[in-house]
Amino acid sequence: MNKKSNKSIYLVQSVQRAVLLLEALANKEAELRIAELSRKTNLNQSTVYRLLGTLRNLNCVEQNPDTHKYRLTLKLFELGSSVINKFNIVQRAIPHMEALSRKYNEAVNLAKLDKDEIVYIHKIESYTTLKLDLKLGSRHPAYCTGLGKVLLAYLEEDELDSYLKRIKLKRFTPNTIVDKEELKKELIMIKQKGYSFDSEEYVQGVCCLAASVRDYNNKVCASLSIAIPSIRLKDNNIPLMIRNIIATTNKISCQRKR
């Protein structure tokens, strides 16, 4: 029996549908009615009602007594936090991220690559006017972000080729690279230089400098970036900033096992 058939045999429909509801509730709307959830998940309202009843009993969702809409509970936050806490790299990174953020008074972010996207696992907010809607656990494209490009650059060649075949390069700004050959050339350059630069490729007006973080086996396991408003980029000594970012990721990276 092949892996594909095994995967379909063990897919439990009720669990799959419950996760669809949780994902719908996790989107930007804080609360949703049963009819809204039905529309977003393509599940009929009676199914949504039954699943919500189970999720309420498990303390994963609750109903607002005033609006009668449903929302997620802190139970999901507890579960998510426990996953992040298992990443030893986050605990190692926090003091160094805080120091880098204080040095430049800019936002500093830490991310991992997961299923063709980057996932934010920690961030230090900027006290300046730059406020990006980057929630912990949120997913973003890898190919047009500084964090993502540095992670893609260190993939094995067959993994990168497979990624480029799967992914569709969507244009977010005039600077987004949407040619796969051009992107591959840039990723080769990133690996050679040891850092990546996102020049308003994902969000207009925002640039990012990023470098890789390594685990105990000296494999790239995460990436760290400074997000800077483009208007302030010229005020910084970019080569020095790059050196400081790389120095920070070297401090965070675990020492190779002997």
Predicted regions, residues:
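N-terminal helix-turn-helix
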Residues: 1-86, 90-91, 98, 254-255
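Short, structured helix-loop boundary elements
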Residues: 11-15, 34, 69, 73, ...
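A structural microfeature
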Residues: 59, 120-122, 222
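A structural signal for short hydrophobic beta-strand segments in well-ordered beta-sheet cores
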Residues: 61-63, 110-111, 213
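All-alpha effector-binding/dimerization core of bacterial HTH-type transcriptional repressors
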Residues: 81-129, 154-157, 183
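Short, solvent-exposed recognition segments
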Residues: 130-202
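Cysteine/selenocysteine-centered motifs that mediate thiol-based redox chemistry or coordinate metal-sulfur cofactors
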Residues: 162, 168, 249-258
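Extended hydrophobic
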Residues: 176-249
